[in-house]
């Protein structure tokens, strides 16, 4: 599915097969998440908590962009979580709170 299926204020892009990067609005659109086959969500934001814990597997990365050292401490856990989601045949959304920032791209496989 294309990111054009999302509301105008939402943004997500499939960066590699079955791995999406998006903002918090994409992560709150339950219908879109299900439509594109998301099964695992990496929430790279200290500001919010997982919204659908009974419907998707979550990895909550509670960090802020300005904590560069802390970002690197999560890379192995994020990669393992993404790999597991893909191994199980699912799709993964990695999302941030507001804008695409280094914390999301750093953690991508």
Task: Give residue spans per PLM region.
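A phosphate-binding catalytic loop at a beta-strand-loop-alpha-helix junction
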Residues: 89-109
């Amino acid at each position: 599915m294309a990111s054009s299926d999302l509301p105008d204020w939402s943004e997500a892009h499939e960066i590699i097969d079955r791995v999406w990067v998006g903002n918090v609005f994409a992560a709150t659109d339950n219908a879109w998440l299900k439509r594109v086959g998301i099964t695992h969500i990496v929430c790279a934001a200290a500001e919010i908590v997982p919204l659908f814990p009974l419907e998707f597997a979550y990895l909550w990365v509670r960090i802020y962009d300005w904590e560069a050292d802390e970002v690197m401490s999560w890379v192995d856990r994020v990669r393992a979580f993404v790999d597991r989601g893909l191994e199980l045949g699912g799709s993964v959304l990695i999302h941030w709170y507001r804008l695409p920032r280094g914390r999301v791209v750093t953690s991508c496989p």
